[in-house]
UniProtKB/Swiss-Prot annotation:
<dbReference type="Pfam" id="PF03449">
    <property type="entry name" value="GreA_GreB_N"/>
</dbReference>
<dbReference type="GO" id="GO:0003677">
    <property type="term" value="F:DNA binding"/>
</dbReference>
<keyword id="KW-0238">DNA-binding</keyword>
<dbReference type="GO" id="GO:0070063">
    <property type="term" value="F:RNA polymerase binding"/>
</dbReference>
<dbReference type="InterPro" id="IPR036953">
    <property type="entry name" value="GreA/GreB_C_sf"/>
</dbReference>
<comment type="similarity">
    <text>Belongs to the GreA/GreB family. GreB subfamily.</text>
</comment>
<keyword id="KW-0175">Coiled coil</keyword>
<dbReference type="Pfam" id="PF01272">
    <property type="entry name" value="GreA_GreB"/>
</dbReference>
<keyword id="KW-0804">Transcription</keyword>
<dbReference type="InterPro" id="IPR022691">
    <property type="entry name" value="Tscrpt_elong_fac_GreA/B_N"/>
</dbReference>
<keyword id="KW-0805">Transcription regulation</keyword>
<protein>
    <recommendedName>
        <fullName>Transcription elongation factor GreB</fullName>
    </recommendedName>
</protein>
<dbReference type="InterPro" id="IPR028624">
    <property type="entry name" value="Tscrpt_elong_fac_GreA/B"/>
</dbReference>
<dbReference type="GO" id="GO:0032784">
    <property type="term" value="P:regulation of DNA-templated transcription elongation"/>
</dbReference>
<dbReference type="InterPro" id="IPR001437">
    <property type="entry name" value="Tscrpt_elong_fac_GreA/B_C"/>
</dbReference>
<dbReference type="InterPro" id="IPR006358">
    <property type="entry name" value="Tscrpt_elong_fac_GreB"/>
</dbReference>
<dbReference type="InterPro" id="IPR023459">
    <property type="entry name" value="Tscrpt_elong_fac_GreA/B_fam"/>
</dbReference>
Length: 163
C-alpha cells in the first residue's frame, strides 16, 4: 500500500492493532530483552541458542512494532454505525449477496489490516469489494475472476457494528 492510499479501518480494527502494539511493546519485547541480556552473560554468543534466537525474535518484534506504528499513523477510522442509512455500498457495509452459483453470502467490507475470510471480512480493495462499492441494494454487479465472469446480486446493505 502506497503512502498516498488511505488506511481505512473500523474502530474494532483500530483497537486490535493498538492492542497488538501494546502487547509487543509492553510484554513481549521486555521479556525478550531480559532473555537476551541473560544469554549474553553466558559467554560465547556464536553458539548460544538463547542469545541467537532472542536477537532474531527481537528483530521480528521491532519490525512488527514499526509496521503497526506506521499503519496506525496512516489510519482513518470509519465507524459504520455512524453512517447515515443508505442502500449504497461503501466502506464498513455489511452486504448480503446472491452469488452466481445460487449461494447466499454475507460479507463485511473492512480495512486491509482486518481481513478475516473465516468471518467473511473482505478488504475494501479486494476485487469483490471493488465491484460492490457504490452499487445499491437490488443491483447486479459483475465480478471478473480467473474462471470467468460472475454475476452477483446485492440483496441487502447494512451499516452495523463490525467486531
Amino acid at each position: 500500500m502506497s503512502t498516498e492510499t488511505k488506511n481505512y479501518i473500523t474502530p474494532a480494527g483500530w483497537q486490535a492493532l493498538k492492542d497488538e502494539l501494546y502487547q509487543l511493546v509492553n510484554k513481549e519485547r521486555p521479556e525478550i530483552v531480559q532473555i537476551v541480556n541473560w544469554a549474553a552473560g553466558n559467554g560465547d554468543r556464536s553458539e548460544n541458542g538463547d542469545y541467537l534466537y532472542g536477537k532474531r525474535r527481537m528483530r521480528e518484534i521491532d519490525r512488527r512494532i514499526r509496521f503497526l506504528t506506521k499503519r496506525l499513523e496512516a489510519a482513518v477510522v470509519v465507524d459504520p454505525e455512524l453512517r447515515e442509512a443508505t442502500d449504497q455500498v461503501f466502506f464498513g457495509a455489511t452486504v448480503g449477496l446472491l452469488r452466481g452459483d445460487g449461494r447466499e453470502q454475507t460479507v463485511k467490507i473492512v480495512g486491509i489490516d482486518e481481513i478475516d475470510t473465516a468471518q467473511n471480512k473482505i478488504s475494501w480493495i479486494s476485487p469483490l469489494a471493488r465491484c460492490l462499492i457504490k452499487a445499491r441494494e437490488g443491483d447486479e454487479v459483475v465480478l471478473n475472476t480467473p474462471e470467468g465472469r460472475e454475476e452477483i446480486e446485492i440483496l441487502s446493505v447494512e451499516y452495523i457494528k463490525i467486531d
